[in-house]
Amino acid sequence: MALSKAEILDAIAGMTVLELSELIKEMEEKFGVSAAAVAVAAPAGGAAAGEGAAAVEEQTEFDVILTAAGANKVNTIKVVRAITGLGLKEAKDLVDGAPKPVKEGVAKAEAESVKAQLVEAGAEAEIK
């Protein structure tokens, strides 16, 4: 007897996250596919359409740039170490060499969080 789509969905809804992860792995192996997200390409158009699409396209990766260490350089170094996982000397060199990127290619929410942490420590930072 074949299961209906509704029965399959109900069974999946009752699974734990671990069970779902294992199910996905087994499906990938059985069907020879990958569950990785696929980027959808924009439709090709004339030059004017391409320029319009580029202007509307939202930036998805951001860089957080430390522009100045601020008055309390020690706190800034501590925050940079916490954010980047760098050693003391590397974090100090980064802070002393400002403006320098602290995090590159991160999501907007993470970039804003990193900037807020740096500003809270007394540093100046910007998101590009």
From Swiss-Prot:
The keyword Lipid metabolism is assigned to this record: no
Entries under Pfam families matching the protein: Ribosomal_L12, Ribosomal_L12_N
A biological process term (GO) from this entry: translation
Any one Gene Ontology cellular component term annotated for this protein: cytosolic large ribosomal subunit
Domain of life assignment: Bacteria
Swiss-Prot/TrEMBL keywords: Ribonucleoprotein, Ribosomal protein
Keyword Metal-binding applies: no
Subunit structure: Homodimer. Part of the ribosomal stalk of the 50S ribosomal subunit. Forms a multimeric L10(L12)X complex, where L10 forms an elongated spine to which 2 to 4 L12 dimers bind in a sequential fashion. Binds GTP-bound translation factors.
Function: Forms part of the ribosomal stalk which helps the ribosome interact with GTP-bound translation factors. Is thus essential for accurate translation.
PANTHER family: 39S RIBOSOMAL PROTEIN L12 (PTHR45987), LARGE RIBOSOMAL SUBUNIT PROTEIN BL12M (PTHR45987:SF4)
HAMAP family: Ribosomal_bL12
Family assignment from sequence similarity: Belongs to the bacterial ribosomal protein bL12 family.
Protein name: Large ribosomal subunit protein bL12
Provenance organism: Acidithiobacillus ferrooxidans (strain ATCC 23270 / DSM 14882 / CIP 104768 / NCIMB 8455)
